[in-house]
Amino acid sequence: MPEDDVRNKFLDAGDSDDDAGHGSDSEDDFQKGGRNAKRRRVSDDEDSEADDFTDAEEEHDQDDAESKDAPAKDGQETTDGKEKKDGKKEKEKKSVLASDLPGMTKPLTKKNLIVTEEAIKKSGVVYISRVPPFMTPAKLRSLLEPYGKLNRIFLAPEDPVARRKRIRSGGNKKKMFTEGWIEFVKKKDAKKACELLNARPIGGKKGSYYRDDIWNLLYLKGFKWHNLTEQIAAENAERSSRMRAEISKTTKENKEFVRNVERAKVLQGIQAKKASKGSKAGGEGAAQVTESTIPSAAATTTTTTNDDKRRTFKQIPLAKKRKLDETQPEQVQRVLSKIF
C-alpha cells in the first residue's frame, strides 16, 4: 500500500510532456496493481493527460505555423535586403567605371576644353584626308584617344548627289565622310600621332572592319580650330550670296514672264473686240462673198494685218516757236516803215 500511494502521488501527478507519448508503458505498470479503483483513477488521469496532450499538440501546431510565417517574412526581408545590396553594388560598379573611364559614356557631348589663349596656343589640329568608309566620329575618337587627349572632331559628310547615286545603284545607306579635322589638346601629341600612324594600317583585332585601312594624317602647322570655323563660315557666306543672286535673277525672270502674259491677254481681248465690230459692220453677205472668192488670201491678209497692227505709243511732237526771221505781213511792214 505505501509503495502504491507513493507511486501514484509522484508518478501520476508529475507526468511530464515527455512521458505523455509513452502510453503503453504506463498501462503495463497499472495492470500490475490489479485493482479496479486504481484503474478508474488511472483512466481519469489518462483522460486528463490526453486532453493535455491535445492542447499541447494545438499549441505546437500554432507555434509551427508562426514559425513557418516567420521564416517566410524573414525570407522576404532577406530578399529585399539582397536586392538593395545588389542595387548598391551595381551603382558602385558604375561609379567605379565612370571614374576609371572618364568621358567614355558620352564622347560626343564633351565641353570645349580649349577656351583660354594659352590652351589655344598649345593645341594642335590634324587633318585626315581620307576617312575610312562608314567610320563615325565616335569610332575615330576611340581609335585616336590612346595617342593623346582630343577636344573636337569635325568630319565633312559625303556629297548628297554622290550619296543618292550610290544608294540608287544598290549601295549602303549608312553615312560616309570624306575628310576631317581632329583637334588635340597638346600639339606635341598631335605631332607624335601623325609621325606614328601616318601611312600605316589601323590594325586591331583580326575580324575588325577597319583593320586593313590606312591612316592618312597630316599635322597642320600654325593652324588652329578658329581658322577652320572661319573658312567654313566664309564658304557658307559665299554659298548664301550665290543663292541670293540666283533667287533675285529667277524672281526678275518670273515677273517679266507674268508681265508678258498679262500683255498678251490684253492684246488678245482687243483683237477679239475689233473682229466682232468688223463682222457686225461689214455684213454677212460681203463676208460670204469674199470668203467664197478668195478664202485663203483673206485668211492670210487678216492674220497679217492683225499681227502687223500693234499698238504703239508715240509722243506728240511739240509746237514750234515762231522764228524771228519770218516774213511779216505787208500791213505791218508798211506801218513800221512809216514809224522808223
UniProtKB/Swiss-Prot annotation:
Record-linked SUPFAM superfamilies: RNA-binding domain, RBD (SSF54928)
Alphabetic keyword roster: Nucleus, Ribosome biogenesis, RNA-binding, rRNA processing
Biased composition (Acidic residues): 44-64
Molecular-function GO terms, alphabetical: RNA binding
Superkingdom assignment: Eukaryota
Compartments, record wording: Nucleus, Nucleolus
Extent of Basic and acidic residues compositional bias: 1-12, 19-32, 65-95
InterPro entries referenced in this protein's UniProt entry, alphabetically: ABT1/Esf2, ABT1/ESF2_RRM, Nucleotide-bd_a/b_plait_sf, RBD_domain_sf, RRM_dom
Region (Disordered): 1-103, 272-329
CDD domains: RRM_ABT1_like
Protein's job: Involved in the small subunit (SSU) processome assembly and function, and in the 18S rRNA synthesis. Required for the early cleavages at sites A0, A1 and A2.
Protein name: Pre-rRNA-processing protein esf-2
